[in-house]
Amino acid sequence: MPTVEELYRNYGILADATEQVGQHKDAYQVILDGVKGGTKEKRLAAQFIPKFFKHFPELADSAINAQLDLCEDEDVSIRRQAIKELPQFATGENLPRVADILTQLLQTDDSAEFNLVNNALLSIFKMDAKGTLGGLFSQILQGEDIVRERAIKFLSTKLKTLPDEVLTKEVEELILTESKKVLEDVTGEEFVLFMKILSGLKSLQTVSGRQQLVELVAEQADLEQTFNPSDPDCVDRLLQCTRQAVPLFSKNVHSTRFVTYFCEQVLPNLGTLTTPVEGLDIQLEVLKLLAEMSSFCGDMEKLETNLRKLFDKLLEYMPLPPEEAENGENAGNEEPKLQFSYVECLLYSFHQLGRKLPDFLTAKLNAEKLKDFKIRLQYFARGLQVYIRQLRLALQGKTGEALKTEENKIKVVALKITNNINVLIKDLFHIPPSYKSTVTLSWKPVQKVEIGQKRASEDTTSGSPPKKSSAGPKRDARQIYNPPSGKYSSNLGNFNYEQRGAFRGSRGGRGWGTRGNRSRGRLY
């Protein structure tokens, strides 16, 4: 094996040869053999091999393999030097291979190495985006689990940093095509990341692009299958997919398939849903999603049937007034509970779909049923007025910091809920019922949000290797507003301020897209 002096001497031969470098194959071979030497020889080889690589195409495989040996050296400084120089090997047909190698090197736990690998990948991305994507997706589809995970996170965090001249329409089409292959077998967490990747592509910002994404989500949600409320994996899949679909819906991209599925398959099973996440009010979560989607529902095939299912579910949460004894006191032991959070969602959804069949209450219900509904509305409205007054009194004069306490935050949300229900009930009391009022759902921001705007999410953009996510999503403690006890004592329900989109579990541990474990070793 060559000494340091021999390496320098052969480096000099190549450096002085200028245009005739390719004639000194023996000198380059000496430098390649430097990877078999000691620490000093390896450091020199890591720098010299890439410098003259392009002049010796017949030694390309040997040169790349020599550099890879250095990328796996026990000495961290040698590894870092070798990784830093890898982009110089990314020429012509070698680029996809280098991209594949760099993708595998993402599995390092050394933060400096991880940074170098990221930078090297970005560097070759700018040389040839398609070739780089070939290497990345090759590992996502066939590589080890840790490599797959980090390659997906690389795409989800780094693609958006690349300029338009790199992410051309053709490149984005390749990303979509390859992503569809991956989506045939993914976990929930991976699915969320891919939706983040795809929804950020410029070519998918159009109406037709958004429609493509909705179809991808619908396919992932298995909307053709019968819903199994007792299977937490089935429930989790539907929730995750619907959360990804909601920001995509607009007046031009309809939610009809999802709303139909919720009305036909989920609402009838609402009380038997198995929660996939401990501490989550699964029924309220489902009703919130339905309410958000109902605004963008198009023409529905079985509108009357589904509206009736929604109406029947609403009645379950709109109690009749308690019977009074002869002395005027409540004959029962307990007042009915008024579940305002649930009613806001159901009433809003009914109000939205009712616009499409405005004579439902007057022509489709018999007189007795309509009378019963109005009694329930009236009773609920009376209880509502009591709480609205109590909430306004509790918040009166409070501004700034005073409104930021947890207790007052909950009361502010409670006031939004009760005000929303009040507006919707007034509409339905009209003769004939009206569907003209507009309200903003209590958990939605008041300011206008652009159609298709993505929800904020945490990025892995630091220079350190991503840490493994915890098994369960981080959620704020449930916040329940308990109004003062009295004639209309009730719970307003749970107010979850957490951002949606977290997924419980990882590949190999859950049924949704669980992938077989593979041990593949070095694939360079």
UniProtKB/Swiss-Prot annotation:
Region (ARM-like and Heat-like helical repeats): 2-360
GO cellular component labels: cytoplasm; membrane; nuclear speck; nucleus; spliceosomal complex
Stretches for region Leucine-zipper: 370-391
Localization annotation: Nucleus; Cytoplasm
Modified residues (N6-acetyllysine): 251
Region of interest: Disordered: 452-524
Description of post-translational modifications: Acetylation at Lys-251 impairs antiapoptotic function.
GO terms classed as biological process: fibroblast apoptotic process; negative regulation of apoptotic process; negative regulation of fibroblast apoptotic process
Descriptive protein name: Apoptosis inhibitor 5
Underlying gene: API5
